[in-house]
């Protein structure tokens, strides 16, 4: 992932080295995001030859990553272009950039490797200068790149747009693309024209845009010579109050480092400071004792520096991206802090989207597009990119503040939450990249679909499901719980019927059988990676205890509600997020047998009512606590391979989960059949509910047996409604192709054959199998 472009002192410019690199290097080497479409020219793909008769010409202002990428994209569509670069070098050294493919995002996490397995592209680290050289070298026509062109102003009318340079030269085209960075002349000129021609609504948005540029943080970044203890391929982050560091060990042994610090105050627009040469020395003196990794201090990194620069980190979101024939891209329109490393990736996406949109304005008859067509195309570009880009800007800026411990909440997150969520950065990074823009004229690269999180335009940041909508769909579950609460009555007292000892034991066994499906499923969900920090992950034991105390019919619908709202399929877009903890998965079958069959056998073999009652009250009533303790203790004696399996075998837990589901199904089916054979009707067994401990002298079957049956029907009705909601999710994202007729048939047939508990487990096990398969969304 690329850090945002930063200006550097002219003395740090390096000479143009376009022809000094080996020609075999591929542009794909520089891009970790699988959807990026700029690649080394492929002989199998013909690039349209641009001539003086091209339908459209784009004047690209700025030879930045955004500008050069846009040139590549336009060439694929046969759209003519010219690039005007202010500097005399296309590739000055203005900062370090991406990640090494063997890097570790934190010293104890292998998140970059996981990201590579998910996306199909490993994370690559290289200097921004190198990427610019590669982009330049592979341009079909380098004569279209003009350096030393400082743009002064622009003009546009219904026929063309004109760029006027400081040296008096003029360049006309159908579109002007502003890729000239944070201090964009094109953006300023565009705003000037909006102020003249805009509506009241446009002017209101313009006022907000004019105060959008701000800076609250600064960055001292540079390159240093190798230091013992900082290995090649490793990445180190450190956080402190008001300051954080990021350091990469490059493949050449050099260290690429960043020191992010909070300014004394937030400044806006023209008030943002511009540091001069020498300011970095005074600034770094305050942080010499800051640890960058283990016992290594920033002072040692600074002492070994090769080059360094000190800049203010601007932040900016804009409402206006285009006006008539003018549009901006890259840092000129969406500027973020570099901690998340998404600045250049965002610029590349904007370039691809702008080219896609402009291509839609091309006419079949070869004539030039009208101003209305150009305006519509650029508006489409804004519409498709604005939301996603601004969400990434917000995420990056927030991440900077978390690392700088800006607030108490940021301190808590950085110190206690993030360290316990080793893959949170991999999740954020993959979420940002998986749904990124694709250049429509090129086929999807095979690698983009080979990872465990295949590319999809329906996934990623900005494409999340609406939680309010999910809550509305799950609202009937809360209504069922409220109905049970309002209708809850004391132990029935009317027309008591004394039961035999065998009937009492049957009541106890049916109570155990009724809990097995919920205990099994809820426990599995609590160990699922994609459910991290959800109610299902944090409170499974509490829900099971409340079910024992208040009744499963009251508690289960509440659990179902929270689980459905907090566990959409987007949480499991990566196959490894379906994975459960391997150590837990291995011991769960034994836990089910011990916790459920143990008390059941003791109750069934009891010869005295008092003994059965004691077992029920103690060994069974507190089973959620025993189950949790059993799993937590035995986890330490079983080898946990989750960290490796999440990368190399995300279905490693599946065989163990199948055993657990099968055992639960067999136990529930056996209890169901035993109840059917031991009572005059199987309905009596089906309608048992989890009750408070039965009195040792007699068991009561009150006059409200019909109400109990209704409760059980509603309980499993809620359970199956919850299950069908999740199957609807699977069908919506395309993971399940089965018809609703088949889904309902399996649920009903398994329920009638072996009871509702079996039906519920069968459906959940089926869902497990579907989620374990990789799904590729067709283009």
Swiss-Prot record:
Pathway: Polyketide biosynthesis. Gene3D superfamilies: FAD/NAD(P)-binding domain (3.50.50.60). Keywords: FAD, Flavoprotein, Membrane, Monooxygenase, Oxidoreductase, Transmembrane, Transmembrane helix, Virulence. The chain crosses the membrane at residues 471-491, 504-524, 542-562, 587-607, 618-638, 665-685, 742-762. It is a multi-pass membrane protein. Induction: Expression of the botcinic acid clusters genes BOA1-13 and BOA17 is coregulated by BCG1 during both in vitro and in planta growth. FAD binds at residues 85, 128, 331, 344. The keyword Hydrolase does not apply. It is found in: Membrane. Pfam families: FAD_binding_3 (PF01494). Its cofactor is FAD. One of its GO terms (cellular component) is membrane. Its EC number is 1.-.-.-. The keyword Membrane applies. InterPro entries: FAD-bd, FAD/NAD-bd_sf, FAD_mOase_fung. It comes from the Eukaryota. Belongs to the paxM FAD-dependent monooxygenase family. This is FAD-dependent monooxygenase BOA8. It comes from Botryotinia fuckeliana (strain B05.10) (Noble rot fungus). The lineage of its organism: Eukaryota, Fungi, Dikarya, Ascomycota, Pezizomycotina.
């Amino acid at each position: 992932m690329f850090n945002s472009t930063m200006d550097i002192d002219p003395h740090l410019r390096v000479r143009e080295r376009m022809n000094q690199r080996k020609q075999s290097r591929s542009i794909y080497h520089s891009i970790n995001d699988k959807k990026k479409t700029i690649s080394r020219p492929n002989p199998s793909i013909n690039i349209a030859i641009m001539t003086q008769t091209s339908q459209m010409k784009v004047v690209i202002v700025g030879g930045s990553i955004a500008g050069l990428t846009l040139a590549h994209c336009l060439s694929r569509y046969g759209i003519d272009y010219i690039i005007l670069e202010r500097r005399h070098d296309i590739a000055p050294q203005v900062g370090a950039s991406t990640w090494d493919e063997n890097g570790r995002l934190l010293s104890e996490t292998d998140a970059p490797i996981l990201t590579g397995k998910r996306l199909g592209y490993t994370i690559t680290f290289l200097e921004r200068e190198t990427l610019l050289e590669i982009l330049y070298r592979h341009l079909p026509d380098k004569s279209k790149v003009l350096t030393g062109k400082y743009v002064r102003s622009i003009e546009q009318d219904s026929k063309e747009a004109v760029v006027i340079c400081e040296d008096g030269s003029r360049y006309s085209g159908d579109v002007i693309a502003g890729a000239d960075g944070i201090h964009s002349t094109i953006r300023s000129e565009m705003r000037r024209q909006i102020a003249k021609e805009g509506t009241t609504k446009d002017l209101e948005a313009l006022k907000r845009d004019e105060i959008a540029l701000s800076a609250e943080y600064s960055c001292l970044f540079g390159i240093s010579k190798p230091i013992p203890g900082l290995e090649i391929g490793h990445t180190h982050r450190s956080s402190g109050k008001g300051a954080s560091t990021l350091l990469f060990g490059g493949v050449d042994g050099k260290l690429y480092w960043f020191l992010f610090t909070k300014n004394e105050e937030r400044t806006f627009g023209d008030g943002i400071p511009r540091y001069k040469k020498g300011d970095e020395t005074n600034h770094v003196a305050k942080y010499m004792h800051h640890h960058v990794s283990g016992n290594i201090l920033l002072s040692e990194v600074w002492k070994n520096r090769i080059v360094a620069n000190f800049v203010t980190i601007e932040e900016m979101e804009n409402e206006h991206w285009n006006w008539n024939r003018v549009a901006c891209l890259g840092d000129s329109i969406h500027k973020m802090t570099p901690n998340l490393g998404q600045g250049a990736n965002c610029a590349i996406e904007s370039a691809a989207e702008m080219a896609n949109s402009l291509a839609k304005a091309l006419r079949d008859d070869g004539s030039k597009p009208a101003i209305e067509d150009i305006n519509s195309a650029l508006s489409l570009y804004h519409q498709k990119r604005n939301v996603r880009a601004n969400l990434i800007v917000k995420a990056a800026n927030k991440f900077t503040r978390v690392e700088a411990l800006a607030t108490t909440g940021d301190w808590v997150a950085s110190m206690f939450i993030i360290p316990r969520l080793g893959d949170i950065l991999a999740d954020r990074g993959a979420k940002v990249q998986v749904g990124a823009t694709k250049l429509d004229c090129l086929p999807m690269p095979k690698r983009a679909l080979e990872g465990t999180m295949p590319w999809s335009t329906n996934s990623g940041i900005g494409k999340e499901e609406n939680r309010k909508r999910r809550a509305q769909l799950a609202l009937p579950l809360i209504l069922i719980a409220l109905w049970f609460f309002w209708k809850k009555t004391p132990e029935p007292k009317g027309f008591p019927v004394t039961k035999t000892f065998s009937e009492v034991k049957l009541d106890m066994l049916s109570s155990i059988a009724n809990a097995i499906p919920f205990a099994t499923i809820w426990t599995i969900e609590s160990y699922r990676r994609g459910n991290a920090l959800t109610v299902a992950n944090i409170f499974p034991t509490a829900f099971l205890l409340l079910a024992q105390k208040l009744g499963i019919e009251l508690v289960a619908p509440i659990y179902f509600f929270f689980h459905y709202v907090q566990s959409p399929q987007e949480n499991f877009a990566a196959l490894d997020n379906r994975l459960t903890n391997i150590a837990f998965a291995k011991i769960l079958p034994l836990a089910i047998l011990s916790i459920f069959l143990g008390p059941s056998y003791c109750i069934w073999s009891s010869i005295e009512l008092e003994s059965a009652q004691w077992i029920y009250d103690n060994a069974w009533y507190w089973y959620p606590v025993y189950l949790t303790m059993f799993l937590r203790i035995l986890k330490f004696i079983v080898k946990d391979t989750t960290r490796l399996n999440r990368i190399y075998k995300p279905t490693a837990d599946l065989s163990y989960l199948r055993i657990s589901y099968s055992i639960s199904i067999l136990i529930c089916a056996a209890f169901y059949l035993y109840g059917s054979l031991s009572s005059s009707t199987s309905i009596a067994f089906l309608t048992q509910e989890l009750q408070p401990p039965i009195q040792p002298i007699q068991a009561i079957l009150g006059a409200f047996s019909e109400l109990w049956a209704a409760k059980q029907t509603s309980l499993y009705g809620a359970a199956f409604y919850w299950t069908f909601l999740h199957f609807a999710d699977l069908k919506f994202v395309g993971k399940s192709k089965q018809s609703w007729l088949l889904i309902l048939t399996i649920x009903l047939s398994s329920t009638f054959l072996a009871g509702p508990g079996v039906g519920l487990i069968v459906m959940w096990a089926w869902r497990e199998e579907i989620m374990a398969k990789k799904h590729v969304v067709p283009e």
